[in-house]
């Protein structure tokens, strides 16, 4: 029917309105309630219209339509008044409410006019009609002619027309009864009148129904117009609602931004709290570190005390390790050279590999460029294909638009055809119309109920969401306030605690600083005391050195006076070798010994000539001196005999590399050192072998020993001579050469070279370092002890001369002097000479010296060269500067 489907020209459909009613709960509550009220009133009006139409088709005996229409009007007015009251409570709804009120007035006027017309026609019909008809269904179900007239069968016709039965053949019947015929005729006449009246009433009813149909069609047309007006009004209402909804979304957006700002402030506060907590934790960690540092400093103090005690013990061990480290340094230098060569090889390989990588990179770049060109070409092809596809899609869209216009036109034609079909169906079947009206009524009721439930639930959900949002907002605000208050309190408490802890920490640090300052002052005072003590010790050492030099000078002058009393024969013609100027010597403990005594050129007689003159002058003297002097004079050589000055000895460490052994000594014998030059001149630009002392010092010592030998008294019965024999040690062993008891003349000079091992071991004693001597210096010595050492040497030389053992070897003499010096510096009595009961022990130990010479020299190599050695402008030691040793 027309009421069920809205007009096609209406801009707003019920489906759209129903879909708008099911909006999410986030929309405005006011708009949802107004929408629900309008839809409720619309459905109620439709329901009232359907009820009025159904009542128009009821029987006249039923209650007059007055009551139904009145009830419908009252219900409509009541629903609209309720909607008006609800809308008055809302904002911005007055205009829409007035429009709805005007629509309600129009509906009431239309309903009143239709009610008056229906009532008037019904009353006229009841006056004319003698028979009451209940409804259209009873009219359709009645059978007026069939029920009242007899059937058209033969017996019925005979009953109706008994006169005409005699015309038929058959047995004769009874004679006709005229009274019965009259009665039947009267009954037929009465029935015919009744049928005519009934037909007239039916025609009147048909006219009435036609009039009602015309009224219903007019009412439908008016309703369509009213619905269109309502659609327009609702469109304006929806526009207002949309504006209101936009304002509501703006307000919600502002609230959301405020909420985000509040959350940002809260997050910032939390970050500040976390930063403060981190700073407090860092402060606690720093405090714990300071405490740990204080404990560590206490431990370090104790450790320093222990180390101070242990350093005095480790000093000697470190000095011994220096020598081993020197060897390791040489090995490390050799390894460094090999590693440097390996590094150069690796660099060459790396350069080649880099060139290979560069070539490979160029190849990859060319390949990449080719691939890029190929991809560019393929991209252009794909672009052309995409353009063609876009053109085809555009043409397809145009065809689709044409098809859509055609479909719209066909839909319009279909709507017109449908309207015509509906009109024809309305005219053909009233029963179908009633069924559809009932179905529409039920659907409308169900839809109204469903919409009411949905709107109620939506309203409740929206109210609940709003209440929950407000409660959550209040709750969050309260929580933020409480948290901010708690955080401020905690921060204040933590700040106060932190200030207290910082004050305590500053006090402790001040106390610790004061303690350290006191300790530093004490240590500085102690250092000053140690420096003063060290200075005093240095002064004592210098004084002792001066006294020792004075004592040695006195001995030298005494020996020189003894020598000057003898006759001075002419000097024999012998090849003289100028002593090489001694290079810079490395001092002990970083100081250089200075000797103020310049050398004096005093002519000396040869040893052999002096011994012969002494023998000629004193005929009763024994010949022991003659047996010992030739070897010593040959060993000392002419340069030693020509010197008259005393030069003190200075120990010189062995700085030759450890590989210098017998092969290095073999290289020392050059072509210039021939047999005609047994004592070759040394190169003044070289220092000679680093293991040997300078030539001037060695020759001075030899001269001094020669004078001691020749001026010593000849006593054979010295009971304490055995006590002067040196004690055999682990590092150096004394060897004593046996000599025949018979005095002999000095043999001629033989041009025979001594073996390299023996030649290298003659003066190796000077290369032996002394850790005790370096550690303590000469500060512990005394002039009395130095005098005793010289007396011991003199006694030893006299013992050799008395027993007839021959000349004292220079190696044994130097070793004995070194032992005496060690025993004087150590003060522990390790090297005190003891009695040697076996006279042949010297020969056995003498044979072991060449085999022990090389390890002793290797062990004596210092680890590092001293800076004084590096800074000197003299060249290093050369193994070729000294020739062979001749006997």
Curated annotation (Swiss-Prot):
Disulfide bonds: none
InterPro entries referenced in this protein's UniProt entry, alphabetically: Centrobin (IPR038923)
One Gene Ontology cellular component: ciliary basal body
Localization of this protein: Cytoplasm, Cytoskeleton, Microtubule organizing center, Centrosome, Centriole
Source superkingdom: Eukaryota
Any one GO BP annotation for this protein: regulation of cilium assembly
Name of the protein in its database record: Centrobin
Residues in coiled coil: 191-557
Keywords: Cell cycle, Cell division, Coiled coil, Cytoplasm, Cytoskeleton, Phosphoprotein
Gene Ontology molecular function terms on file: protein domain specific binding
């Amino acid at each position: 029917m027309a009421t069920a489907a809205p007009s096609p020209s209406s801009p707003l459909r019920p489906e759209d309105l129903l879909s708008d009613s099911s909006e999410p709960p986030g929309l405005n509550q006011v708009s949802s309630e107004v929408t629900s009220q309008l839809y409720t009133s619309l459905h109620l009006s439709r329901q009232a219209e359907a009820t009025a139409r159904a009542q128009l088709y009821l029987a006249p005996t039923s209650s007059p339509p007055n009551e139904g229409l009145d009830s419908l009007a009252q219900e409509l007015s009541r629903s609209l008044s309720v909607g008006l009251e609800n809308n008055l409570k809302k904002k911005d709804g007055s205009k829409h409410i007035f429009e709805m009120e005007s629509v309600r007035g129009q509906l009431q006027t239309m309903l009143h006019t239709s009610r008056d017309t229906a009532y008037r026609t019904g009353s006229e019909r009841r006056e004319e009609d003698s028979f009451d008809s209940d409804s259209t269904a009873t009219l359709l179900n009645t059978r007026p002619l069939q029920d009242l007239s007899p059937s058209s069968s033969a017996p019925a016709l005979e009953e109706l027309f008994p006169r005409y039965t005699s015309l038929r053949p058959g047995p004769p019947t009874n004679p006709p009864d005229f009274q019965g015929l009259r009665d039947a005729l009267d009954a037929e006449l009465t029935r015919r009148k009744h049928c005519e009246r009934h037909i007239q009433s039916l025609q009147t009813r048909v006219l009435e129904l036609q009039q009602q149909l015309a009224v219903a069609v007019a009412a439908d047309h008016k309703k369509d117009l009213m619905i269109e007006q309502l659609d327009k009004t609702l469109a304006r209402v929806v526009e207002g609602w949309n504006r209101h909804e936009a304002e509501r979304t703006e307000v919600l957006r502002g609230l959301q931004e405020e909420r985000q700002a509040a959350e940002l402030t809260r997050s910032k506060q939390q970050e500040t709290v976390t930063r403060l907590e981190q700073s407090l934790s860092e402060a606690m960690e720093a405090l714990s570190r300071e405490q740990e540092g204080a404990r560590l400093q206490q431990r370090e103090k104790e450790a320093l005390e222990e180390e101070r005690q242990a350093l005095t013990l480790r000093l000697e061990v470190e000095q011994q390790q220096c020598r081993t480290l020197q060897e390791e340094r040489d090995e490390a230098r050799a390894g460094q050279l090999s590693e440097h060569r390996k590094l150069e090889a690796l660099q060459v390989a790396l350069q080649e590999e880099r060139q290979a990588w560069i070539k490979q990179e160029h190849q990859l770049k060319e390949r990449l460029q080719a691939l890029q060109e190929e991809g560019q070409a393929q991209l252009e092809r794909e672009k052309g294909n995409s353009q063609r596809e876009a053109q085809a899609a555009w043409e397809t869209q145009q065809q689709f638009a044409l098809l859509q216009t055609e479909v719209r036109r066909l839909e319009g034609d279909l709507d017109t055809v449908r309207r015509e079909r509906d009109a024809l169906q309305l005219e053909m079947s009233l029963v179908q119309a009633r069924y559809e009206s009932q179905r529409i009524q039920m659907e409308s009721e169900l839809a109204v109920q469903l919409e009411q439930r949905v709107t109620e639930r939506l309203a409740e959900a929206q109210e609940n969401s709003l209440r929950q949002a407000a409660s959550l907002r209040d709750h969050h605000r309260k929580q933020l306030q409480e948290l901010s208050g708690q955080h401020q309190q905690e921060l204040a408490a933590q700040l106060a605690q932190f200030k207290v802890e910082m004050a305590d920490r500053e006090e402790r640090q001040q106390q610790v600083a004061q303690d350290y300052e006191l300790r530093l002052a004490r240590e500085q005072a102690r250092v000053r005391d140690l420096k003063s003590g060290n200075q005093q010790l240095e002064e004592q050492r210098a004084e002792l050195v001066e006294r020792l030099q004075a004592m040695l000078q006195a001995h030298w002058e005494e020996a020189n006076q003894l020598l000057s009393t003898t006759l001075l024969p002419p000097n024999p013609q012998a090849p003289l070798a100028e002593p090489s100027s001694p290079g810079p010597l490395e001092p002990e403990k970083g100081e250089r010994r200075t000797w103020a005594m310049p050398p004096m050129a005093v002519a000396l007689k040869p040893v052999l000539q002096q011994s012969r003159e002494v023998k000629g002058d004193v005929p009763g003297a024994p010949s022991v001196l003659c047996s010992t002097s030739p070897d010593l004079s040959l060993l000392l050589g002419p340069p030693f005999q020509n010197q008259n000055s005393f030069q003190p000895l200075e120990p010189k460490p062995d700085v030759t590399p450890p590989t210098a052994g017998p092969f290095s000594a073999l290289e020392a014998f050059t072509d210039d050192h021939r047999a005609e030059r047994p004592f070759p001149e040394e190169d003044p630009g070289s220092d000679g072998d680093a293991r040997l002392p300078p030539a001037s010092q060695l020759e001075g010592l030899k001269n001094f020993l020669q004078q001691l030998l020749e001026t010593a008294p000849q006593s054979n019965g010295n009971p304490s001579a055995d006590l002067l024999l040196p004690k055999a040690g682990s590092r150096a062993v004394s060897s004593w050469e046996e000599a025949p008891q018979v005095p002999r003349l000095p043999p001629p000079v033989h041009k025979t070279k001594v073996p390299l091992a023996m030649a290298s071991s003659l003066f190796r004693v000077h290369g032996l370092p002394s850790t005790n001597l370096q550690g303590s210096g000469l500060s512990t010595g005394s002039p009395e002890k130095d005098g005793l050492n010289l007396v011991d040497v003199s006694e030893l030389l006299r013992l050799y001369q008395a027993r007839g053992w021959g000349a004292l070897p220079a190696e044994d003499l130097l070793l004995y002097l070194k032992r005496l010096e060690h025993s004087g510096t150590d003060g522990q009595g390790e090297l005190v000479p003891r009695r040697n009961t076996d006279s042949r022990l010297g020969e056995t130990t003498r044979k072991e010296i060449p085999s022990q010479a090389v390890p002793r020299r290797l062990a004596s190599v210092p680890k590092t060269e001293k800076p004084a050695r590096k800074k000197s402008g003299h060249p290093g030691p050369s193994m070729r500067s000294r020739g062979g040793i001749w006997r």
